[in-house]
Design a protein with these regions (language model features):
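N-terminal phosphate-binding or glycine-rich loops at protein starts, especially the Walker A/P-loop
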Residues: 1-54
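C-terminal non-catalytic interaction/assembly regions of soluble proteins
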Residues: 256-410
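Accessory alpha-helical/coil subdomains and C-terminal extensions
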Residues: 99, 107-112, 118-133, 153-292
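Short glycine/serine/threonine-rich phosphate/pyrophosphate-binding segments
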Residues: 15-25, 49-50, 85, 90-94, ...
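Glycine-rich oxoanion-binding loops at beta->alpha junctions
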Residues: 52-106, 115, 154-156, 168
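Short beta-strand segments
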Residues: 9-10, 41-43, 69, 78, ...
């Protein structure tokens, strides 16, 4: 049987472990020289591939250099937010598959979130429609943890660890003074509040900060919020509040829209930012106390220093499992995570396969039963779900300059 080539790309927002998934795909692909001749990478995703920018991993990261991917955050191959046309009759599809044929591609992998799975769905459906034998699979990635049909996603554990650790540090900082203060921490999450919920992991004891946590899964009432803040002063003069960027009122209006005009990205999603600043001003003006807001921003997704070992290992495993599945003939699937617990309650995880067509353009939100009735906190069920995902510290090698030795694409 003649050998074919494997190609992999990354898309959407990067994470601390998207390169670990890439490592899993590339390293496993290289373990099968009897079937796979070259392992290629698309520079800047499907958009870069259309422009002809591709690298060969055997040349770009030979030998042990490939290991550097496991500790490098961001997206080594670069990313894009290119949306394939809805109609499979669009000329871009035959153009893509002609390029696949010219490069003798037999396996296509795309690492990303919801919109990336949409790309995998369209390509796999076009392949089936035209009789192409290319195996097309999606590798999950998102700090938002909002992909359905999987227990969780690579990237979430490390981002959750960063959020919990940073919130704990902010708590320590706020406790320096005895004067009343409110610190509002704005955390990523448009429609799904998984990352903001992870701030609850920062607590050391019952009644510890953050005293209030608000997710987009429930409606946010500004008057009730102010009452909750006032009541929280009975527990601590320094109140920490964690909010998702996508919190909204009962009419669906984003809280940030009360103060800001909001643009949209290339997929039509509103670009949210500013609810923390709005609430800071609301608290200061209405309650007359010192208030400040902190937006964690991109550091939530790119912090290698807070990389979870569990997250890293699972990301690698997902990449390896995907290649094995593709070699066994699977296509049109996304690798999923299946949670298992041993008799003594120890957390373990297995990989599975899910139909990508049932996943793309859907969102998994935090279950309402994991949110308190008043919508200002999460329950112990969430803590039990999330805590295993942030375990373990990854040792990041440093160079002579004292800084992390990440791999860079030249």
């Amino acid at each position: 049987m003649s050998r074919k080539n494997l190609i992999v790309g990354q898309s959407g927002g990067p994470t601390a472990v998207i390169n670990s998934s890439l490592y899993g795909v590339v390293s496993e692909g290289m373990r099968h020289p009897e079937a796979i001749e070259h392992v290629y990478g698309m520079i800047n995703g499907i958009e870069g591939f259309l422009n002809g920018t591709v690298l060969d991993f055997a040349e770009a990261l030979p030998g042990e250099k490939l290991d550097g991917l496991k500790v490098t955050p961001g997206a080594y191959l670069g990313s894009c937010r290119y949306k394939l046309p809805e109609s499979l009759e669009d000329p871009v599809y035959p153009r893509l598959f002609k390029k696949f044929e010219e490069m003798n591609i037999g396996w296509f992998f795309y690492i990303g979130g919801n919109d990336s799975m949409d790309t995998v769905s369209k390509l796999s459906r076009y392949a089936a429609q035209t009789g192409s034998d290319i195996r097309i699979l999606g590798e999950p990635k998102t700090i938002d943890n909002d992909l359905i049909h999987t227990d969780h996603t690579p990237g979430f554990g490390s981002a959750a660890r960063y959020v919990a650790s940073t919130v704990r540090e902010i708590i320590i900082d706020a406790n320096v003074y005895e004067k009343k203060s409110v610190t509002i921490i704005e955390i990523m999450g448009r429609h799904a509040g998984w990352l903001t919920a992870a701030s609850a992991l920062a607590r050391k004891y019952t009644g510890d900060n953050p005293l209030l946590i608000y997710l987009p899964e429930t409606a946010f009432d500004q008057e009730e919020f102010l009452k909750a803040v006032e009541n929280s002063f009975e527990k601590n003069c320094n109140v920490i509040v964690c909010v998702s960027e996508g919190i909204h009122d009962d009419k669906g209006t984003f809280i940030c829209e009360y103060d800001n005009s909001v643009g949209t990205d290339t997929f039509g999603h509103k670009m949210l930012a500013g609810c923390g600043k709005y609430l800071e001003n609301l608290v200061r003006n209405r309650l007359g106390v010192k208030a400040r807001s902190v937006e964690l921003n991109v550091s939530q997704r790119c912090s290698a220093s807070m990389m979870s070992a569990a997250d890293q290992q699972e990301a690698i495993k997902a990449g390896e499992f995907g290649v094995q599945a593709a070699l066994n003939g699977e296509t049109g699937k996304m690798i999923s995570f299946i949670r298992k617990e041993t008799a003594d309650g120890t957390y373990t995880m297995d990989c599975g396969l899910e139909d990508v067509n049932a996943i793309c353009n859907e969102e998994k939100t935090v279950p309402l039963e994991w949110i308190t009735e008043d919508g200002s906190d999460v329950t112990e069920a969430f803590i039990n779900y999330a805590r295993p995902l942030i375990q373990g510290t990854v040792q990041i090698p440093c160079g002579e300059d004292g800084l992390p030795s990440f791999v860079y694409r030249k």
